[in-house]
């Protein structure tokens, strides 16, 4: 592992924990409760504040702000934190806030994500692995984005929304309710527009699994998602269908995005 390099113009608090092989570029500011894993790269003009942990080999581009106080009027300075996993790419002007006392106290970002320029992750969000936020996408507080979710550019996700594994949100889309795993959401007032077929095929879903998901989705569209899911759950189902049904029947503070009438 290469030695750690810190530019002379960077301000790194002596109490910060900086791992082996890190690169901290010009005009970065690193607070006393920050922990950087091995090989983390902060390009330049990056601010990392609060109790923020950044995992190994994550690269942060200029003017990102990580761990500054939540944009929540109820926040009163309580001790909370931001945890960012390994091998993430955090592009220019990205903002990520720590948790709040009322939301569990921790914002978590998984591994291998791509957060494009200007995207935002608010307080208390739980973000899975390999998640992509395209330019200027915003995720409000308390949201859950499971693994392999993609949120298109200029899209917004309402607070407390859950987005299931492998779902795709199109560009310029407002997501106000939960999105089932493998769903495709489009339109200014987001609606469920079928399955994320490209994502399913990339992950090796078989033709039979895709047909089963389509059949399930057709039945869900005929009535209440929860009532229909309870009925479908009584039958034998493959793992992908079971995952969707379990998601629908799980705890939630929101309704579900339904197919466009």
Swiss-Prot record:
InterPro entries: Acetyltransf_C, Acetyltransf_C_sf, Hexapep_transf_CS, Lipid_A_LpxA, Trimer_LpxA-like_sf. Signal peptide: none annotated. It is found in: Cytoplasm. Its EC number is 2.3.1.129. Keywords: Acyltransferase, Cytoplasm, Lipid A biosynthesis, Lipid biosynthesis, Lipid metabolism, Repeat, Transferase. It catalyses: a (3R)-hydroxyacyl-[ACP] + UDP-N-acetyl-alpha-D-glucosamine = a UDP-3-O-[(3R)-3-hydroxyacyl]-N-acetyl-alpha-D-glucosamine + holo-[ACP]. One of its GO terms (molecular function) is acyl-[acyl-carrier-protein]-UDP-N-acetylglucosamine O-acyltransferase activity. Pathway: Glycolipid biosynthesis; lipid IV(A) biosynthesis; lipid IV(A) from (3R)-3-hydroxytetradecanoyl-[acyl-carrier-protein] and UDP-N-acetyl-alpha-D-glucosamine: step 1/6. It is an enzyme of class 2 (transferase). GO terms for cellular component: cytoplasm; membrane. Homotrimer. Belongs to the transferase hexapeptide repeat family. LpxA subfamily. NCBIfam families: lipid_A_lpxA, PRK05289.1. This is Acyl-[acyl-carrier-protein]--UDP-N-acetylglucosamine O-acyltransferase. It comes from Paracoccus denitrificans (strain Pd 1222). The lineage of its organism: Bacteria, Pseudomonadati, Pseudomonadota, Alphaproteobacteria, Rhodobacterales. The gene is lpxA.
